[in-house]
């Protein structure tokens, strides 16, 4: 059974490149493309894909608003933010909006495919370049204080510390 994808980006070259790349991955099928958040919500309502790759900054409706709508209407649909924004506050906002992943457009194509596979396996995926900042933000939040709680299992915590180690080694 293939993973059904909707690709959402307001830049035609990016959207078409992603769709073309994913269409060559054996277990993945691009079932729709959207140019903004409103189109993405409509496509998800019609097609019920497994995963939506979502740009965040788009006209008409931004990716964060679209993510909230998609996740509230269709909890089984996984949204992966794919953006240029590495700012910690935007990453946190996307995760709190319901994104199952946050990947940077500077990522290698194989990393984006791995991210889609990870969210399909029930995991949360975050680009290594921003993982440390996300863990720092959520570890500083009081437990049970809000409606959204992030469950970091020991494996996920060890993954985060591996990213920390990799970042430190790269920064040296």
Say what each PLM segment does:
Residues 27-35, 43:
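Short hydrophobic/Thr-rich beta-strand motif most characteristic of the beta2 strand and flanking loop
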Residues 9, 55, 83:
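Active-site residues of response regulator receiver
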Residues 54-55, 66:
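Active-site T/S-Asp motif of two-component receiver
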Residues 89-96, 101, 106-152, 157, ...:
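Short, flexible helix-to-coil linker/hinge segments that flank and couple to helix-turn-helix
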Residues 47-53:
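Active-site beta3 strand of CheY-like receiver
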Residues 58:
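Receiver (REC) domain active-site loop signature in two-component systems and cognate sites
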Residues 36-39, 62-65:
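Acidic catalytic/metal-coordinating carboxylates
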Residues 2-14, 18-22:
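Conserved acidic segment of CheY-like receiver
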